[in-house]
Amino acid sequence: MIEEISATITTAADGSATVYLSPTYSGRVHAIKYTAGTLDAGTDLVITGETTGVAILTDSPAASEWFYPRAFPNQATDGAAEADATCDIYIVKERIKVVVAQGGNTLTGTITAYIDSNQW
């Protein structure tokens, strides 16, 4: 079952914000929807698992956008990233953390994650 979790982003005067998509979830990160609202174009987003720090997405979208994050698997022989393949990103019993920079002075937007919790 795909779960939808959202949070409103409200920046401080310096354009920064940190929000958490709650509650904790376990599953595959299927998609991320960024709705810019009044946030500045080129707002920096860094999205990770709160506990593990697993990288989910880093981007500076110019406007509202959908993302389908994937990771590069590592080669068994030397640990180097395999550039020709991708694998799903999972979170386990944690919230998703969204760190925002350069979003503009006290502006708002929305971040939504779609988690496929039937992967277990």
Please tell me what each predicted stretch does:
Residues 1-120:
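Surface-exposed, low-hydrophobicity beta-strand/loop segments enriched in small/polar/acidic residues
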